[in-house]
């Protein structure tokens, strides 16, 4: 993966951003710019978005550009967006939750530019929408694999920030763990960063030192997996198939496939019929999936997970189905009750089986 990225950057890097491709005659009036919170070489969140960008450029013929490692909560984001608009880019895709307020303000300022925000909830009626995926679906499946793999009964979860997106993933993962291994527990350690390999690795090591023999994560690098590999533990990565970084530790990963969604956004802009929405795609839509399961995982486990995957896609299984209690034993869902989207999107509690605090 990194060799492909290096070749791409070697061709087109300058002034802190990269312009890629020349577009087509049909798409001459539409140009799409992507703002990334991490480096393209993270092999995780940003890498997955850049794969989607490349796919969209190839499918639509539209010129694209990107800028990487743009921090949240600073003036850098707005400055980069203004630079892109000055260059004629009229589709702006921001790929981090913390960009949301800036994107909302910029969408009002530039009504002729399409703004699409990944992972947020803000939108308007004209030129600003949001996109995300039901990652809790493959998170649940990956938890089934992890629960089947643990021998100590303790799984460490290295996580960035206590926001609903991350908490929802931890809970779905834990419910999958419990489906395979009801006595196993998941302990969360917060890093307060999306991408810092040193911090991620240290956090994973702290969990390994506590006796965890499987590490899961909501982070952007493979550092946690490398620590698991060194300790002889197992690992569930995130964002992409990171098996190359820790092949002996790797179990599976919930992964993103942004390309088709980006094609839809860009094609709508080209046709001048972009309509803002809150898109929350699923495994059935293809925006999220489960990476291949490691070859040394018992076939009975693979069969169990694939059966659950088929049931989720068919609408016969929902990870957040009652009875469901929070970690203090309070009932959240009654037997057979399915959690509504609004409750999932605002989730700020841990389910039973999680060790740690959301605060």
Predicted regions mapped to residue ranges:
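A residue-level marker of the well-folded mature domains of exported/periplasmic proteins
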Residues: 26-359
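Bacterial N-terminal signal peptides that target proteins for export
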Residues: 1-9
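Hydrophobic helical h-region of N-terminal Sec-dependent signal peptides
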Residues: 9-15
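C-terminal motif of bacterial Sec signal peptides marking the signal peptidase cleavage site
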Residues: 18-21
């Amino acid at each position: 993966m990194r060799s492909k990225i290096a070749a791409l950057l070697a061709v087109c890097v300058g002034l802190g951003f990269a312009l890629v491709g020349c577009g087509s005659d049909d798409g001459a009036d539409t140009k799409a710019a992507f703002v990334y919170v991490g480096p393209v070489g993270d092999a995780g969140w940003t890498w997955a978005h850049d794969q989607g960008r490349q796919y969209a450029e190839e499918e639509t013929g539209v010129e694209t550009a990107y800028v990487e490692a743009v921090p949240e909560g600073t003036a850098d984001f707005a400055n980069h967006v203004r630079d892109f608009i000055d260059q004629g880019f009229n589709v702006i895709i921001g790929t981090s939750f913390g960009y949301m307020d800036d994107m909302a303000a910029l969408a009002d300022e530039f009504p002729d530019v399409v703004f699409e925000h990944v992972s947020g909830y803000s939108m308007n009626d004209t030129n600003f929408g949001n996109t995300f995926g039901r990652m809790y679906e493959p998170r649940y499946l990956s938890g089934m694999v992890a629960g089947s793999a643990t021998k100590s009964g303790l799984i460490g979860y290295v996580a960035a920030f206590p926001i609903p997106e991350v908490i929802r993933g931890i809970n779905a993962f834990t419910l999958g763990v419990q489906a395979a291994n009801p006595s196993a527990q998941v302990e969360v350690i917060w890093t307060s960063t999306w991408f810092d390999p040193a911090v991620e690795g240290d956090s994973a090591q702290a969990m390994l030192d506590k006796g965890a023999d499987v590490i899961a994560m909501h982070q952007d690098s493979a550092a946690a997996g490398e620590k698991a590999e060194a300790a002889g533990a197992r690992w569930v990565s995130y964002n992409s198939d990171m098996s190359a970084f820790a092949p002996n530790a790797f179990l599976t990963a919930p992964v993103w496939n942004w390309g088709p969604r980006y094609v839809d956004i860009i094609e709508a802009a080209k046709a001048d019929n972009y309509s803002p929405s809150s898109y929350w795609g699923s495994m059935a839509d293809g925006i999220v999936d489960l990476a291949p399961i490691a070859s040394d995982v018992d076939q009975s486990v693979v069969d169990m997970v694939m059966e659950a995957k088929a049931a989720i896609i068919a609408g016969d299984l929902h990870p957040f189905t009652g009875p469901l209690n929070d970690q203090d034993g309070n009932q959240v869902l009654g037997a057979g009750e399915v959690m509504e989207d609004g409750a999932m999107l605002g989730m700020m509690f841990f389910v039973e089986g999680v060790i740690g605090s959301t605060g």
